[in-house]
Amino acid sequence: LDIDDFKSKLTTKTKLVSLLHISNTLGCCNPIKNISKLAKQNGSLVMLDACQSLAHQKIDVQELGIDFLAGSGHKLCGPTGIGFLWSKREILEKIPPFFGGGEMIQDVFEESSTWAELPHKFEAGTPAIAEAIGLAEAINYINNIGLDNIQRYEKALTKYLFQKLNEIEDIEIIGPPPEVDPNRASLATFYLKNIHSNDLAEILDSKGICIRSGHHCCQPLHRHIGINSTARVRMNFTTEKEEIDIFIEKLK
């Protein structure tokens, strides 16, 4: 994210700044501390989508100066269909519930209702019990491995992946390389000049390699850079260097 461009878009009407920590397509890590500082000077709250970073690096919400943080269960090696929102208590106290149902009320009258204490006022009805238990276990699993260990290992994998991809002719990689953005995600988004990314994904699938192809939920980004679609390969702490070699061999 370009800081000067961000400054130009902040106005007195900006109530909330909502942005990604790490791009799921470009892989770049945004300068959140600087953005939060500018937003606070403007009187704006900051909402951080950390789905792409929570399982890959330590995040200190106090240090970043943010007001909200959103996370996703399945991107933390947990179940699908569950996520979470962190915020400061004083902010959550002011926010009205957005779902109605059992357990989130204190008193109900014909014309009005009062709400239960936090966090219950945001947990209407029967919660996703099994998913919540699974998410907690996934978080424990990641913490036992250690986020510092995970980040160090994934940085080495990312550097190796970019090195091997750059050996392939007619490939264009989208996003900053590891030497430019050392905190970038352990992924690579690219396209080959002589084949559509969807066709590439099908060919690799037939060879036992699963990648993502298309817009990656980022159609405006693809239009901005003038590309119809891209291919993306993603790694995490379970990926081995030998698997990168196999992927590159099949890609060639």
Predicted regions and their residues:
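Pyridoxal 5′-phosphate
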Residues: 1-252
